Amino acid sequence: MSSGGLLLLLGLLTLWAELTPISGHDRPTFCNLAPESGRCRGHLRRIYYNLESNKCKVFFYGGCGGNANNFETRDECRQTCGGK
């Protein structure tokens, strides 16, 4: 196979991996956790994955502690946990 063909194949595989939705079996287990504001008193707007609605939603984070179901952007949440 030529180098151009290999690059095309690599590009198609990368595109497929980016566009394939995350299934429940592939989703990290922390995506199932409820949002936790943590023990500090900040008021930071963050995003968490909501398993019941299959959506990334807003919550307010205190700034420390909490759990890993805590993202700065919806895109980061969607890429990690799936959802809308």
UniProtKB/Swiss-Prot annotation:
Superkingdom of the source species: Eukaryota
Disulfide-bond pairs as recorded: C31-C81, C40-C64, C56-C77
Species: Daboia siamensis
Tissues in which the UniProt entry reports expression: Expressed by the venom gland.
UniProt-recorded Gene Ontology molecular function terms: serine-type endopeptidase inhibitor activity
UniProt-recorded name of the protein: Kunitz-type serine protease inhibitor 7
Family the UniProt entry places it in: Belongs to the venom Kunitz-type family.
Record localization: Secreted
InterPro entries: Kunitz_BPTI, Kunitz_BPTI_sf, Prtase_inh_Kunz-CS, TFPI/VKTCI-like
GO CC annotation, single: extracellular space
Pfam families for the chain: Kunitz_BPTI
Positions of the record's site feature: Reactive bond for trypsin: R41, G42
Leader sequence segment: 1-24
